[in-house]
Amino acid sequence: MAALHWLLLAALLGCTLAEEQAIFYNCEEASEAVCSVKEVRINPCNPNKKCIFKKGVNASISFDFEPNFASSKLVTTLYGPFDVEFDEMTNVDACQYTKCPTEPGKSQVLDYTLYIGKKLPQGTYTFKWKLWNPEETSQLCCFKTTIKIRK
């Protein structure tokens, strides 16, 4: 029985370690007084290197944010280089991936799994993630992080 507990603990620890904190910074257009991103976790990601995504597999992105606004609806968009929106992640109902309504000053987590398409070009990119109240677009959270896509 003790061996089973150790096995479960090791499995849980392995899952926790697989998703690492990513280096990120807030977007210029977002005010931390309105919404602050506290932590970004990406799998696969190594905190000592860039997050490296392999084509043809899924990557999971999770981030903690604290909105200072109340909203019953949230919309999210993922932007690639040159602020080009990803087709699959444009004006998506974010309430599918985090709790709605938001409450001012209450931390939340957004979890999303993204397929890394085989047609995406290899290279190192900065992407931007925006989350906002569609009824008041100045109420937004936003961060940027750098990833690498490889074969």
Curated annotation (Swiss-Prot):
Q: Which SUPFAM superfamilies match?
A: E set domains
One of this protein's Pfam families, by short name?
E1_DerP2_DerF2
**A biological-process GO annotation:** sterol transport
Q: How is it modified after translation?
A: N-glycosylated.
Localization annotation: Secreted
User: According to its UniProt record, where is this protein mainly located?
Assistant: secreted
What GO molecular function annotations does the UniProt record carry, in alphabetical order?
sterol binding
User: At which residues is glycosylation annotated?
Assistant: N58
Q: Name one GO cellular component term.
A: extracellular region
Is Glycoprotein given among the entry's keywords?
yes
Q: In which tissues is it expressed?
A: Hemolymph (at protein level). Constitutively expressed mainly in fat body and also in hemocytes and secreted into hemolymph. Not detected in midgut, epidermis, or Malpighian tubule of naive larvae.
Where does the signal peptide begin and end?
1-18
UniProt keywords (A-Z) are: Disulfide bond, Glycoprotein, Lipid-binding, Secreted, Signal
Q: Which cystines does this chain contain?
A: C27-C141, C45-C51, C95-C100
Q: Does the keyword Glycoprotein apply?
A: yes
Inducing stimuli? Not induced in larvae following injection with microorganisms.
The organism sits in which domain of life?
A: Eukaryota
The UniProt function text for this chain reads:
Binds to lipopolysaccharide from a variety of Gram-negative bacteria and to lipid A.
The text of the family note is: Belongs to the NPC2 family.
Please state what the protein is called: MD-2-related lipid-recognition protein
Native organism taxonomy: Eukaryota, Metazoa, Ecdysozoa, Arthropoda, Hexapoda
